[in-house]
Structures are given as C-alpha cells and as structure tokens.
Amino acid sequence: MGGLCSRSSSVNNAPGGTFAHVNGHHLNNNASDLNSHSGESGLKDDPSPVTENVDDNKHTSESFSFPIVSSGSHPQNIEDGIPRLSRVLSQKSRSTKSRQAAVAKVSEVSSLLGRAGTMGLGKAVDVLDTLGSSMTNLNLSGGFSSATTVKGNKISILSFEVANTIVKGANLMHSLSKDSITHLKEVVLPSEGVQNLISKDMDELLRIAAADKREELRIFSGEVVRFGNRCKDPQYHNLDRFFDRLGSEFTPQKHLKQEAETIMHQMMSFVHFTADLYHELHALDRFEQDYQRKIQEEENPSTAQRGVGDTLAILRTELKSQKKHVRNLKKKSLWSRILEEVMEKLVDVVHFLHLEIHEAFGGADPDKPANDPPINHKKLGSAGLALHYANIITQIDTLVSRSSTMPASTRDALYQGLPPSIKSALRSRIQSFQVKEELTVPQIKAEMEKTLQWLVPVATNTTKAHHGFGWVGEWASSGSEANQRPAGQTILRIDTLHHADKEKTEAYILDLVVWLHHLVTQVRATTGYGLRSPVKSPIRSPNQKTIQLSSGSHNPSMGLPLLTTEDQEMLRDVSKRRKTPGISKSQEFETVAKARLCKHHRLSKSSSHSPMMGEMMKNKKDTFSTRRPSSVPIIDFDIDRMKALDVIDRVDTIRSL
C-alpha cells in the first residue's frame, strides 16, 4: 500500500502549493495549511484521514470508493461540488478483491494437487486435466461471453475452411429438421434398398441412423475445436473438454433453437459472400497473370506487336476493378470477421445440434452399438468397398441400357472389376442357369429391372457421397445452396452402400451378371451381333470351334453399315497378328522379328556383312507362307460393322461350355 499512497501524495503535493486545475483556475488560497495537510498524509503513510472521512459518511455507497466532503472542508471542492475519487481507497478495494480471488483460486488448486498426490498417478492425470480445463474461468467475465477482453485476429485466409465447416453444420442441422426426420422414417428406412441390403429391423436402422448423425456431429465439433485453439482468447482453447461435458446434458432449451437458426442463417449469408470471394480471387489471379504477360511482351522488342499498349491499358483497368471488387467481398464475407466472434456462434450451434440429435433419436439407445463387432467387418463401408461396388452396379446398368452398342473396353472393365468371390462363383452359376421358358430380350431386361430399380439409386447416392467435401472450396460450387434444399434431398449415409452387408450385395451383383450373360446370348441369337458376354473369360474351353466369317453370313435385310477404310486396315492388321496354333510365342516373335529387320533398319547395321541375313531376306516370303499357312484368314469386307469389330476383338468364335 505504500506505493499506492506515494502515487496519491505525488498528485496532491503540487510544487509551490499549486493544485490541479479546477474549472481552469489555480487554487493558491491557504497554501501553507494545505501543504502541511498533504505532507502529513504523504510522509506518515497513514490512510487514517481517509478512513475517518469514510466513517463519517457511511450513507455513501462503498462501491464507488470516494468520500463526499463538505463544501467548507477543502478549497478544491468549492468550485463545482462534485465528489472527487480517492485513488488510495479505490485501488485498495480492487487489490483486496483480486487478492481474495487469487487466494481462493490458489487454495483450490493446492487442494486439487494435494488430492492428486495422495491418489496416485492415474488420478493425478485426471485432476490435471480438470485443472487445465478450468483455467479458462480465471478471467472475470467467465463463460463464453461476446465481450471478450482479448482482441482477436481476423479470419482472413482461414475463412474458406471456416465456411466449409459452417456448411457442414448447416447440412447437419437441415437433416435434423422435422421434415427430414419424417422423410427418413417414412421413406428412406422402409425403402427396398435399405431393407434388402442392411436390415429389416427398424430399431436397428434407427440406431444406425442416430450413430451416423453423432459421427457427423463429432466431425463438425472437431473442426470447431481446431479453430478454437487458434483463437487468442484462452476461453476457446480445449473446447473438446467442454463438448465432452455436453454428452450428459439433455435438458431442452426452447430459446436455443430459435437462436441457432438465426445464427446459422446469418453465418450462411457470410458463406455466400465467401463463396463469391473464392471465385473472384481465382479471377483476380488470372487477371494478374495476363497483365504480367502483357508487360513482358511489351518489354521484349522481338515479340512486340501493334496495339499492345491499348491492350495493356485495358488489362490494367480490369485488374484495378477486380481488386476493388475483391476488397468489397472481403468486407462482406468471413474474411474480415473476428475468429472469436464466429467461435461464439459455432459453440452454440454445437450445443443445439447435440440436443436435436437426442430429440430426434431419443428412442435409439446411443450406448448400444448399431452392429455387433464380429460382423462389422462384413459391411462395405468398413471394408472400404462401397465405392467400388457402386461402380460395378453402375456399369451393369449401363450395359443393360445399351446392350447392342457397348464397346469392348467397358465390357472388359466390368469383368476385371468383379470381386474374386463373384468370379469364382460365376462359372458354376452360368452352367447351372436354367430358364423355364425361352425369354425375349425385353423380358430379360424386365427381370433385371426389378433389382436395378432399387439398387442403382443406392449406388448413385454412394458415388455422390464419396465425391462430397473432398477439399477446401468445393462447398463454393455445391454447398452454398445447402439451406435451400427441399426436405429429403440431403444424402444420408444409411441410404448408401456404406452399411450394406457384403454377402447380400455380392449375391445381388452375381445374379445381375448371370442375367446379363443370358441377355447377351439372346441379343446375339436374335440380331446376329451385339455384346460379347463379359463372363466369357472364366468358362473358356480348350476345345474351340473356329468359324470363318464369310459373305454368306451377312443378312442384307438388316441394313447395317459397311466397314470404312480405317476399319478394313485395322482388320487386316489384327488378322496378320493372329497367333498360329502350335507355335510358341518365342518362335513367333523370332519369325516376326526376322521379317521386320532389314539392312535399312537402324538397329541392324551389320546386316550387310552377314551372309545369312541376305539369304534370310531372300527367302522371307517363303518362310512366312510355309510356317503360317492358317494365320491369315480370308477377309470378306462385305460384312456388317459389328461383326468386323468382333473379329478385331477376337470374339468371332463360338466356344463350347
């Protein structure tokens, strides 16, 4: 307190008996008495005069910490009659309160550490975690208050990641609305895809849906925690401990829903401007590159052209206008917002979403796992096969819709992408496949459509879900209308192949592939052309009957297009490269290599010095004709285009089963 009194005496002991200005005048009356009074209070270091004055005026509130002095006491109070603040008592009151709070906090910490020392290492870790999470309460404001004492930084370049997180929260909030929950329970869960691939038990499906929403909330809150750790204000640090305590709080708060909706609407408006800023920054970068390139062209006399100066002036004007537009967008978007202000709103949104999930799926037990651990590995999502199986289903649907004009590359890609379990079971299923009566092509497609009509939408949702939010800024193109989607349009994980049973899905795919093989057989039998069955490879037989394509097999009434010149040349080249049965690959390679190497070739410089090379080149045609008599079939170009393509693809043979 000595220091505080010294500061007070230094103010009161003005040199020459002159006091501070009061209404613009110096007070010099009774200088000797005043100096003696001030010197007494300063030298004795005794606050008793102030204390007596306070005791005489007990009716004055102690919180203001100043005495009311009568008009005749001191001359400095005569002019305006306004009470003056006593610095000694004010600072004494504040220091006393802060010292008491500090003593209480230290005693609490010491008691915690004392208990930790007596309970062992494990308990000490828990106590230290509790202590660390309570350190944010050391500030006087306490809680998540908007009137923060620490001035935070602007979000700036981090605004795109913050916008990405806000869109995730908006999507989750939209999926928890009453309309979306009604759509989930009445449309999604009873659908054929969910019932056939996941489960027919509605309670289990509700538990799965609730677990998905909690997982989305965990991801969203994790990003909020990451942004909170970047704040200057320490009360937003380690928010994960605060969110963990929310797990046991399910008290509904009516006002919180309205506040959360208002907050999200406000933040989504910032997200829209941030999305525009994202695109305009890319445009600004292009303008700057064009401007710099024009400057280089103008400085280089060899590449200088007429009108470059005018073009440069136009680019300079556009660049200046674009920079101004970007500055305006930065002011309207999240770029210029304070991170602490946004964090305060995001914390409220996390709290609201936690309560909404509990209200929407209150009947689903969160502690009971949606799937038993022994069978969890049989789900496509946990096995990482959901997207791959979705692509297979999409390819099958494409082949069925274009069964007569599908290129061979797509057919081969389908077979190569089949899982090993389907490939191993495919041969026996095709051999045992029997139909009671011969079905036409439309009838076969109708049978396949019974499965494809509910399986293809699930595969499509899987592909869309995997392509969402893969990188920062994707929300700028697709996520900005998240709050404008109608109910039921948000893709739910339960409506994809993520939770689909692996064995059930493979059984449906195998059935579709077998029907596809039967469809191809019927198409080829009725039209004489079409798809090569994508399942032909595993049932090849060494006993093959080769049928030469001749002009007699062509049906002129079909009106199919003839071969073009390029197709004829390609067909010749493929026919020349046909392998001869009974000749190994090494022998065939040697024959072709000898036929191609000549003395004019760059890699055969010593050919003119070899006597055997000249003899070989002399008898080249005879060797080719004697060793490969059946390798060049008679090509009849008066055939339809599809049959010629089958010859090119080497599918012009009928292979016995």
Curated annotation (Swiss-Prot):
User: InterPro entries, alphabetically?
Assistant: DUF3475, DUF668, PSI1/2/3
Top-level taxon in the UniProt lineage: Eukaryota
Q: Which GO terms describe its cellular component?
A: nucleus
Q: In the UniProt record for this chain, what is stated about the effect of gene disruption?
A: Short roots and hypocotyls due to both a reduced cell number and reduced cell elongation. Plants missing both PSI1 and PSI3 are dwarf and contain reduced starch levels; these phenotypes are partially rescued by sucrose.
Polar residues bias spans:
1-15, 26-39, 62-76, 540-556
A Pfam family the protein falls into: DUF668
Q: Where in the cell is it found?
A: Nucleus
The entry's keywords = Developmental protein, Lipoprotein, Myristate, Nucleus
Where is region (Disordered) located?
A: 1-80, 534-559
Biological processes annotated in GO: positive regulation of growth; regulation of carbohydrate metabolic process; response to peptide hormone
Indicate yes or no for the key word Transport. no
What are the lipidation residues for N-myristoyl glycine? Answer: 2
| Protein task | Promotes seedling growth probably via the regulation of phytosulfokine (PSK) signaling; PSK are peptide phytohormones acting as growth factors. Together with PSI2 and PSI3, required during vegetative growth and reproduction. May also have a function in carbohydrate metabolism.
Stated name of the protein:
Protein PSK SIMULATOR 1
